[in-house]
């Protein structure tokens, strides 16, 4: 049970963390473009 729960949590968190990293990188890229202009 514990292993299944942990695997479920990991499978749920991994896509969220990857999406968060992409969003933060995209926002920083947008800010950099605005600052350069």
UniProtKB/Swiss-Prot annotation:
An individual GO BP term: cytochrome complex assembly
Record GO terms (molecular function): electron transporter, transferring electrons within cytochrome b6/f complex of photosystem II activity
Compartmental location: Plastid, Chloroplast thylakoid membrane
Cellular component annotations (GO), alphabetically ordered: chloroplast thylakoid membrane; cytochrome b6f complex
Pfam families: PetG
Membrane-related topology note: Single-pass membrane protein
InterPro entries in the record: Cyt_6/f_cplx_su5 (IPR003683), Cyt_6/f_cplx_su5_sf (IPR036099)
Stored SUPFAM superfamilies: PetG subunit of the cytochrome b6f complex
Membrane-spanning ranges: 5-25
Keywords assigned: Chloroplast, Electron transport, Membrane, Photosynthesis, Plastid, Thylakoid, Transmembrane, Transmembrane helix, Transport
Record's function text: Component of the cytochrome b6-f complex, which mediates electron transfer between photosystem II (PSII) and photosystem I (PSI), cyclic electron flow around PSI, and state transitions. PetG is required for either the stability or assembly of the cytochrome b6-f complex.
NCBIfam families cross-referenced by the UniProt entry: PRK00665.1
Assembly and oligomerization: The 4 large subunits of the cytochrome b6-f complex are cytochrome b6, subunit IV (17 kDa polypeptide, PetD), cytochrome f and the Rieske protein, while the 4 small subunits are PetG, PetL, PetM and PetN. The complex functions as a dimer.
UniProt family annotation: Belongs to the PetG family.
Protein name: Cytochrome b6-f complex subunit 5
Organism of provenance: Chlorella vulgaris (Green alga)
Gene: petG
């Amino acid at each position: 049970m514990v292993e299944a729960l942990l695997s479920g949590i990991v499978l749920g968190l991994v896509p969220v963390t990857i999406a968060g990293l992409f969003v933060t990188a995209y926002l920083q890229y947008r800010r950099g473009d605005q600052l350069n202009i």
